[in-house]
């Protein structure tokens, strides 16, 4: 697993494990020095930019207090002393009860089918050889990748799986602001958001929330390019040392993402089709005609516009770093590149 050394001081190291990170921003929210930065969450989740969810400033203000590591639900941040990670009852990831499978398991594979992180597998699955009508095998959960969403337990027909969520909370999406860009759907680590399939002329929600799967991490909020989503953490569920103090800090408004990417355009490759202008959720929020997919008036937009047959960036600062433009471009003429954090 890839490791990023964020800072080293004497025999202590601040280490980031990007493959475990879900882009929730809890670490950024709780950092007392503002040393951690989150940005381009949607683009990172979609695999459309070469960067990680989290970066660290180089101001030297970090005091290695370990608060960021303590609230990380997946163990993506570590404070190490002499190379050994600090893990005790004051760390949320260590306090979380592991997702486990007991002897009631019939190895049916439903949990494998629904796991959003593909961290469950069944080994040596075969019909029992004792004459009974049952399956034998081993159902294995990779705890390093499990996000404790509970999908597996919810679909298990025998109640063989136990789990514990990291947070309790509330989810709110403003339908008047949401542009149905699907950035939140692609980002959610728990598959708790989806788009319903509607029939002709049927009114359906732009995005539907699966409450029972949500872990209230806040990754969707960090990813939304138009700030249509608010996730609040009301409680830390596992018993852990210093829980009340951490809950108080996490009850504050979540940290807003930093612009950690920059839009790039290949003018020679651009067809001037305007697909990116129409699909851009920031543009669509500004202009309801674009949200309806109208192909006219492709100039005078807040972020992207077509001028003289070529797309151009109007204002980098309003970009939500979702990379929807990059996804829809038929000529690969627009993309996001990493922007250095001061």
Predicted regions and their residues:
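Ferredoxin-like iron-sulfur electron-transfer modules
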Residues: 3-23, 41-64, 83-107, 124-148, ...
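DNA-contacting interfaces and partner/effector-binding or oligomerization modules
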Residues: 1-2, 30
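Iron-sulfur cluster-binding cysteine motifs and their immediate structural context
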Residues: 26-44, 67-85, 110-127, 151-166, ...
